[in-house]
Amino acid sequence: MIERGKFRSLTLVNWNGFFARTFDLDELVTTLSGGNGAGKSTTMAAFITALIPDLTLLHFRNTTEAGATSGSRDKGLHGKLRAGVCYSTLDVVNSRHQRVLVGVRLQQVAGRDRKVDIKPFTIQGLPTAIQPTQILTQIVGDRQARVLSLQELKERVEEMEGVQFKQFNSITDYHSLMFDLGVVPRRLRSASDRSKFYRLIEASLYGGISSAITRSLRDYLLPENSGVRKAFQDMEAALRENRMTLEAIRVTQSDRDLFKHLISEATSYVAADYMRHANERRIHLDGALELRRDLFSSRKQLSSEQYRHVEMARELTEQNDTEGDLETDYQAASDHLNLVQTAMRQQEKIERYNADLEELSYRLEEQNEVVEEARDQQAENEERADAAELEVDELKSQLADYQQALDVQQTRAIQYQQAQQALERARTLCQLPDLTAENADEWLDSYQAREQEATEILLMLEQKLSVADAAHGQFEQAYQLVSKIAGAVSRSEAWQVARDLLRDSSSQRYQAERVQPLRMRLSELEQRLREQQDAERLLQDFSKRNGQDYQPEELESLQQELDARIETLSSLVAEAGERRMTLRQELEQTQQRIQKLTARAPVWLAAQETLTQLSEQSGETFEDSRQVTEFMQQLLERERETTVERDDIAARKRQIEAQVDRLSQPGGSEDPRLNALAERFGGVLLSEIYDDVTLDDAPYFSALYGPSRHAIVVSDLSLIRDQLAGLEDCPEDLYLIEGDPQSFDDSVFAVDELERAVVVKVAERQWRYSRFPEVPLFGRAAREMRLEGLRDEREALAEQYATLSFDVQKTQRLHQSFSRFIGTHLAVVFDEDPEAEIRTLSSRRGELDRAMASFDGENQQQRQQYEQAKEASGQLNKLIPRISLLCDETLQDRVEEIRAELDETEESARFIQQHGVTLTKLEPLVSVLQSDPQQHEQLQEDYTQAQNAQRQAKQQAFTLTEVVQRRAHFSYADSAGMLGENAGLNDKLRHRLEQAEAERTKAREQLRQHQTQLTQYSQVQASLKSSYDAKQDMLKELLQELQDIGVRADADAEARARQRRDELHAALSTNRSRRNQLEKQITFCEAEMDSVQKKLRKLERDYHQMREQVVTAKAGWCTVMRLVKDNGVERRLHRRELAYMEGDELRSMSDKALGALRLAVADNEHLRDVLRLSEDPKRPERKIQFYIAVYQHLRERIRQDIIRTDDPVEAIEQMEIELNRLTEELMAREQMLAISSRSVANIIRKTIQREQNRIRMLNQGLQAVSFGQVKSVRLNVNVRETHTTLLNVLSEQQEMHQDLFNSNRLTFSEALAKLYQRLNPEIDMGQRTPQTIGEELLDYRNYLEMEVEVNRGADGWLRAESGALSTGEAIGTGMSILVMVVQSWEEESKRLRGKDIIPCRLLFLDEAARLDAKSIATLFELCDRLEMQLVIAAPENISPEKGTTYKLVRKVYQNNEHVHVVGLRGFGTETPETQEPAS
């Protein structure tokens, strides 16, 4: 009997507290006992690390971290190690009694992340005497040892003979070896498998019901049905492969379309370029000839333009010279007009100033007289006012003195003093030192008489002065008038000059009256002179234009000649227009006919090309439309016959395929209903039992069982008797045999074997004789042999069917081609050749073009002559009315005479105009000039002296009068007499003072009034004098300016000057217009010459280039034609309909095809390179080479086994037919490969039933397990309701959902997912694809719901949840579930490992003290019954009488921390020695 593998020991090297410690593991339970921090969890962590060295999974948390989202930073491993190399190894002995040391090397990695480096390794073949610590450490002293590095360990192991050391770089390889050696219960292929294993170990370590496991019990307990899944995958793969083949066919069809597209685009690309080059070659030849004709005509045109340019340049030079003269004359006329206008304005100003001066002179004389009179009166008033003022002052002084004397006692003295003062003033003023108060009267009389005499003398001189002033004013006025007219004249010659001026004024007035008639006469003559000059210029211009000098007398006869010539040319031009219109109409008709034929020619050529192709395909020649329709009827008959023969072959083929399908049924059942019945009855088909029978025995067994070879073998017939009552869907004869399907034999029949036959005794009175069948079908080998023959026959029929299908499709395509031809081209294909008529019409069009060109040249020359004659006639019409002017030769002399006479009269008129008023004033005053009153100044001086003497005499008389009046003051008689005299004198003085003040007031008022009046008179005089002087100065300036202007300012001068200027402006404008016209014509002519020269140069260049292109293209064209003819592609490339397309259209067609070809040949390096080379426009032969390369490439791709042609175009057509046939066959094959939804449902149901039975057997092993109040534990398995509905629909209602399973777009998995969604629309599928959901639905595990139930106390069976159980009960229940999982894994992996290997079983339990003694005993019993090892940890000893117990105590010794370990193997056994690891 094979023994189960066991873990012998666990070794820790250089762990925290354990330097080199080996724990021997008990075959059942190993207990680690110790206080908190003793090292129990560290020991278990070392075990788990060696078992699952995956840092992504390892996480050794404390029980206090149960509610935390994350554990310690180093996941509990870094802190359990010491610095340096650490080891954790497991010593295992497997079922083969092989010792294997599996473990890991651990080492802390420096850094703040607290990482740990792990390296797994194994050592096989290690002798039993060698302990793990001996090989992992090296003794270096009596009590010292060091840990070996992994490399040193490897070297040490390799030195041992028969010992193998293996280091692993991947955890998968490590676990794979552990599975093969029986260390782990299942193969851990992926991280998911490792995670499940770690979750199981973790769940056992921490105890309780692990939600991570209970939530996914299906993944832990139910094995993956890889066989069924692989069958489904194979079916889908076959379908996928079939569909991929179909897709490949479609791709091939697209490739065929691509090839067709390639040949089509290549033909378009090369043919368009080929025909474009052919067209361009023809166009270049025609262009070269046309350029040569244009070159000759341009040279002729250039000569004509050059001659015309010379003539116009000469005329322009003359016009420029004339324009310079006219501009000079026009500028002079404009200046003269400006001077005349200025002189006219000056003359107007002079006349206005003369009138103003006459008026001012008269007013100034009057004002002078008024001012003189006012001055005299003012002088008298001043004297009178001064005298009155003196008198008042004297009287006031006297009155004041007398008043003062009356007021005080000294009045007499004051009066005396005043009298003395008056006497002194009188002496001084009168220059009389001997004057006294006594002789004052005498002197007063004499001075009064002297005053009277001076006054009389003054009055006499004033009268003389007044008379002298009058005579002197007339003489000065007359003298000023003479000086104004004649300039500076002496006073003695003034009278003679005045007489001469008055004598000459009469003749000058007569001359002034003749100015206007002379001006009118001169204006008329000047106008005629200008007209004569204009006529002479017109005559000169006319002579220049006609190239001949003409006399005025010859103009009338020349006019008659021109009129006759114009009439002749007009009739010729009119006739030429009619003739040209006739030629134009004929040319347009010809062009319209050519256009119609050109538009019809491509259609006709395309129809001819199609007719040629149809003739080649059919091998017939067609002359008219009747033959075409008759041949179509023949095609229909041929197609009908071939179709009938093809359908017969298809029927035979279907029969064979039905036989193949029937023989291909699983288990050899020819009727699918038998499989359902066998499943229903719980039996097995007899054909399945004998499925492995050999080919030689197949005839015997087939004859042996005869009609019952399709029977169903059941274990008990009585059990199915009731089911037969309602049986409907079954064969007519259903055979049932009772027997054990696992050990069935043929002993149920009594049989005698004959020569190739058997006799079967069915009953006592019934025998059956059966011959061996010629083709036995009993057993898989016989069926496969028959299937092979049927398949061969089917292949032959398929080939024959393919040939007939090919012929039918070929006939159909030919019929379709004829149908398209009739609908598209039959109306035009048998018409006359339009190209022949186009060539005839093109020749006629060329003749018409040449005739019209010649005619246009003649017509243009006639039109030029006609225009020239009309222009000359117009000029003559202007000259003929002026012939008399041209013949008048005395006109210039008469103009000069009148102009000289007019100058004289204008001079006299200007003199009269300037001095006429002055002469009129001078005429009555001329006699005054005969005598000059020279004594006027002396009389004026005498008058002034007399006036001064009179004023002095008056003052002297006044002072003497004052002395005489104060004479009494010089002596007083007494005081009373002096007072009385003073009182009388006071009254007298007062009376005189009043009179004097009244006179003074009156004198002041008169003086003020006269002073105001004199001021006004003086202001008016000054204003008039100023105005007179200003206007006199302005008049002098105006006269000087008029003299400086030097023109006559008469009434008609401005009109004449303006008329002259306007005439010259009109002539200048006409000249400039002609000059501008000539300049424009010269510019246009030069531009035309430049254009013609550029055109000529371009034509020469283009002509030479065109000739070079023609020559070069000829060589290249010869190469192209040689390639085309040598390779036989001329018929495909020379597409005559393309000749009617423009070069741009052909280039666009070629470019579009090139773009499509680049995409088409992107994956073909050779064609891509050839295409790239063909893009060179200078090498057209490379496009032909590309076309040839495309044809060669397609010829190489032709399958000669199915296509019988070398022409790629025909091969493409045959390929299309063949691909259609293959598509039909593959679609039929896909229907054969389709997965039956009913069979899928049956397979899933069978698998579910098998797994439910397996779970029930696992439950039997847990029925006796009890923990606390938990009496029993079981695993409940149910099928989900939604999935049950899905299975029912798949098996019974699949017809309702054939739209999913018959769709070519969906795989079976996708169809299954769509059906599931259709049945359960309320379920959210999330982001998963239908393929993923379908694959899940093909896995039976997804149909099951699993949960753990416990039988607890009075509650009965309830769901196992931690909240409903105590801690111990939960730990025990969880441990039971884990044991079930381990058992399930072992059974699942049994077929994957060696038959002589039973894997180790080991679980963990930390903090086992939470279990009571009964539960612990149950655990021990469970481990004993299941041959399972268990490692538990608890603070106290648990059941020390069983298993092995280790007591751990952590101590500090000499500043070093270590764990003291004591081991106990049950009660009564010997205690091992205490071991203390070296520190």
UniProtKB/Swiss-Prot annotation:
| Key words, A-Z | ATP-binding, Cell cycle, Cell division, Chromosome partition, Coiled coil, Cytoplasm, DNA condensation, DNA-binding, Nucleotide-binding
Per the record, its GO cellular-component terms are: cytoplasm; nucleoid
**Cysteines engaged in disulfide bonds, as pairs:** none
Against Pfam families, the record matches this protein to: MukB, MukB_hinge, SbcC_Walker_B
Q: Which processes are annotated in GO (biological process)?
A: cell division; chromosome condensation; chromosome segregation; DNA replication
Its localization reads: Cytoplasm, Nucleoid
**Positions that bind ATP:** 34-41
| Main location (coarse class) | cytoplasm
Region Flexible hinge: start and end of each range?
A: 666-783
Query: What Gene Ontology molecular-function terms does this entry list?
Result: ATP binding; DNA binding
Q: Which residues form a coiled coil?
A: 337-418, 511-604, 780-810, 847-1116, 1206-1265
Its domain comment says:
The hinge domain, which separates the large intramolecular coiled coil regions, allows the homodimerization, forming a V-shaped homodimer.
Assigned protein family:
Belongs to the SMC family. MukB subfamily.
Q: Which PANTHER family match?
A: CHROMOSOME PARTITION PROTEIN MUKB, DUF4476 DOMAIN-CONTAINING PROTEIN
> Function, please?
Plays a central role in chromosome condensation, segregation and cell cycle progression. Functions as a homodimer, which is essential for chromosome partition. Involved in negative DNA supercoiling in vivo, and by this means organize and compact chromosomes. May achieve or facilitate chromosome segregation by condensation DNA from both sides of a centrally located replisome during cell division.
How does this protein assemble?
Homodimerization via its hinge domain. Binds to DNA via its C-terminal region. Interacts, and probably forms a ternary complex, with MukE and MukF via its C-terminal region. The complex formation is stimulated by calcium or magnesium. Interacts with tubulin-related protein FtsZ.
Q: What is this protein identified as?
A: Chromosome partition protein MukB
